[in-house]
């Protein structure tokens, strides 16, 4: 059984309490067992599509997809891979906005399993704790590495940072291109979707909200 960090447990519990957790079922399968079963199913799917898996270009594709799903693009389904979080006391008394802009993220649309490609901007006003800057990027990418809808992704990042930092004063905006819109259906290659999640003073103060959004 995978040992979960204290931070992973409190973040997961907070998301469950707010109804913001990704719809998931508990699985007792190991990562290797998941990969084996996914590989088998992908072999069946590709065969049904009429692809020749005896061809050397396709022979390893089911294995590659299985490994990619479990170890890479859906690794955020496993809280055992939640990033190690570094927090320090706010001894400097910082009480102004800290913002990390243009955090690159790649996720997967849970409706069609195609790419969501975009950027996030994250800001918070410290209370008692300050988080290592790279940890913000890692938290964004942890939640991106799941089948997602952008609205939930944005809220998950917000709640995770709020509980870790011990403050409601957190703000997130995500702007992304959805390949379920770009590469199929309406096939609109130019549109982007922006979602915002605001907490604490970012929600209650028009001036603080404007400061965040005007530079997001």
UniProtKB/Swiss-Prot annotation:
Family label: Belongs to the GTP cyclohydrolase I family.
The organism of origin for this protein: Tolumonas auensis (strain DSM 9187 / NBRC 110442 / TA 4)
Entry keywords, A to Z: GTP-binding, Hydrolase, Metal-binding, Nucleotide-binding, One-carbon metabolism, Zinc
Catalytic activities: GTP + H2O = 7,8-dihydroneopterin 3'-triphosphate + formate + H(+)
EC number, as in UniProt: 3.5.4.16
Broad EC category: hydrolase
Binding site for Zn(2+): 109, 112, 180
Subunit structure: Homomer.
Family annotation (PROSITE patterns): GTP_CYCLOHYDROL_1_1, GTP_CYCLOHYDROL_1_2
One Pfam family recorded for the sequence: GTP_cyclohydroI
Name of the featured protein: GTP cyclohydrolase 1
């Amino acid at each position: 059984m995978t040992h979960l960090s204290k931070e992973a447990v409190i973040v997961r519990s907070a998301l469950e309490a707010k109804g913001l957790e990704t719809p998931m079922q508990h699985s007792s399968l190991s990562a290797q067992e998941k990969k084996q079963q996914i590989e088998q199913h992908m072999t069946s799917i590709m065969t049904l599509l009429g692809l020749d898996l005896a061809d050397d270009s396709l022979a390893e594709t089911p294995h590659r997809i299985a490994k990619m799903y479990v170890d890479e693009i859906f690794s955020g389904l496993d809280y055992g891979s939640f990033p190690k979080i570094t927090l320090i006391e706010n001894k400097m008394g910082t009480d102004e906005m800290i913002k990390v802009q243009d955090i690159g993220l790649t996720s997967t649309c849970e409706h069609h399993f195609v790419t969501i490609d975009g950027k996030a901007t994250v800001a918070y006003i410290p209370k008692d704790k300050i988080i290592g800057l790279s940890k913000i990027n890692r938290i964004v990418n942890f939640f991106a590495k799941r089948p997602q809808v952008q609205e939930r992704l944005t809220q998950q990042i917000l709640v995770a940072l709020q509980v870790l930092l011990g403050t409601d004063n957190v703000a997130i905006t995500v702007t992304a291109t959805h390949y379920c819109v770009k590469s199929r259906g309406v096939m609109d290659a130019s549109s982007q979707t922006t979602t915002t999640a605001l907490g604490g003073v970012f929600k209650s103060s028009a001036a603080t909200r404007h400061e965040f959004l005007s530079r997001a």
